[in-house]
UniProtKB/Swiss-Prot annotation:
<comment type="pathway">
    <text>Cell wall biogenesis; peptidoglycan biosynthesis.</text>
</comment>
<dbReference type="Pfam" id="PF01820">
    <property type="entry name" value="Dala_Dala_lig_N"/>
</dbReference>
<feature type="domain" description="ATP-grasp">
    <location>
        <begin position="109"/>
        <end position="306"/>
    </location>
</feature>
<dbReference type="GO" id="GO:0008360">
    <property type="term" value="P:regulation of cell shape"/>
</dbReference>
<dbReference type="GO" id="GO:0009252">
    <property type="term" value="P:peptidoglycan biosynthetic process"/>
</dbReference>
<dbReference type="InterPro" id="IPR000291">
    <property type="entry name" value="D-Ala_lig_Van_CS"/>
</dbReference>
<feature type="binding site">
    <location>
        <position position="260"/>
    </location>
    <ligand>
        <name>Mg(2+) 1</name>
    </ligand>
</feature>
<protein>
    <recommendedName>
        <fullName>D-alanine--D-alanine ligase</fullName>
        <ecNumber>6.3.2.4</ecNumber>
    </recommendedName>
</protein>
<keyword id="KW-0067">ATP-binding</keyword>
<keyword id="KW-0547">Nucleotide-binding</keyword>
<feature type="binding site">
    <location>
        <position position="273"/>
    </location>
    <ligand>
        <name>Mg(2+) 1</name>
    </ligand>
</feature>
<keyword id="KW-0460">Magnesium</keyword>
<comment type="similarity">
    <text>Belongs to the D-alanine--D-alanine ligase family.</text>
</comment>
<feature type="binding site">
    <location>
        <position position="273"/>
    </location>
    <ligand>
        <name>Mg(2+) 2</name>
    </ligand>
</feature>
<dbReference type="InterPro" id="IPR011127">
    <property type="entry name" value="Dala_Dala_lig_N"/>
</dbReference>
<feature type="binding site">
    <location>
        <position position="275"/>
    </location>
    <ligand>
        <name>Mg(2+) 2</name>
    </ligand>
</feature>
<dbReference type="GO" id="GO:0071555">
    <property type="term" value="P:cell wall organization"/>
</dbReference>
């Protein structure tokens, strides 16, 4: 903990976890890990699950600030951030606008493309789409994903002609907005952001039989490989870190977050998506990169919370 910041200065902290989104189980793991870390540091932290408690309890319970460990809808998409703004309670992470835009992969890509930042070509799908024409335009393989879900929920990799519609229907079970994205053949990276700095890159390498870095690879398997340092030349590492920071700031991101990207076989980068409330589980990526940067998990949680002191 910062020498100038004592545990008492944080007052009473609500660690918001769980919620009602499809990512509730991951959020419970994240929140409980954060709660344990803050408690170890002597901070008066308490679990707060908005699925079972009223937000009015934040006021009646005299909470001074909130550590948001929610993932997905109603926790990561600006809704909770807006409620906390109205209540006048400081909270961790991005504000209303950046949270809402960051949760929407389509609008995120629109902003990046308009600003000249590199992102893979895409098409939006609905039940009336010409799926054959989309396959022809983007080429196979194609990634299909709900535009407003995280943790790779509802995501598919289309590798055979004529199967795009089935992938769309799977994604549409989770969101009315469905994104079809051109496959980038290369390496996948993630960049954690804390404050004004980008953490060391992590290169993701799912097990050989996995088609992509899906929910199972993220949270359930132990054979997914994470390379940090990523093994890139220093100049390329710093260039990708800067790109991630630029992409995060363009959306109005603040506090902390994570940006996912890929490089093709020639080393050209392509932004994939931004996460304004990343996971904090034992499989999570921001804590992993922070450790490489010399920041242990407890210190990371306190650093994120310190940003609510203003």
């Amino acid at each position: 903990m910062s020498e100038t910041v004592s545990a008492k200065k944080f007052g009473k902290v609500a660690v918001m976890l769980g919620g009602t989104s499809a990512e509730r189980p991951v959020s419970l793991n994240s929140g409980n890990a954060v709660l344990a870390a803050l408690t170890r540091q002597g901070i008066d932290a308490h679990a707060f699950d908005p699925a079972t408690r009223s937000l009015g309890d934040l006021m009646s319970g005299e909470f001074d600030r909130v550590f948001i460990a929610l993932h997905g809808r109603y926790g990561e998409d600006g809704c909770m951030q807006g409620a906390l703004e109205l209540l006048g309670i400081p909270y961790t992470g991005s504000g209303v606008m950046a949270s809402a835009v960051g949760m929407d992969k389509w609008r995120t890509k629109l902003l990046w493309r308009a600003a000249g930042l590199p992102t893979a070509d895409w098409a939006m799908l609905d039940a009336t789409s010409d799926f054959a024409a989309t396959e022809a335009r983007l080429g196979l393989p194609i990634f299909v994903k709900p535009a407003r879900e995280g943790s790779s929920i509802g995501m598919s990799k289309v590798t055979e002609a004529g199967t795009l519609q089935a992938a769309y229907e799977k994604a549409a079970e989770h969101d009315a907005l469905v994104l079809a994205e051109k496959f980038i053949d290369g390496a996948e990276f993630t960049v954690g952001i804390v404050g004004d700095s980008a953490l060391p890159l992590i290169r993701l390498q799912p097990a050989a039989e996995k088609a992509f870095y899906d929910f199972e690879a993220k949270y359930l398997r132990d054979d997914t490989q994470y390379h940090c340092p990523a093994g890139l030349p220093d100049a390329q590492e710093m260039s990708l870190r800067k790109l991630a920071l630029d992409a995060f700031r363009l959306l109005g991101g603040r506090g902390w977050g994570r940006v996912d990207l890929m490089t093709d076989r020639l080393g050209n980068p392509y932004l994939l998506e931004v996460n304004t409330s990343p996971g904090m589980t034992d499989h999570s990526l921001v804590p992993m990169a922070a450790r490489v940067a010399g920041i242990d998990f407890d210190a990371l949680c306190v650093t994120i919370l310190e940003q609510t002191l203003g």
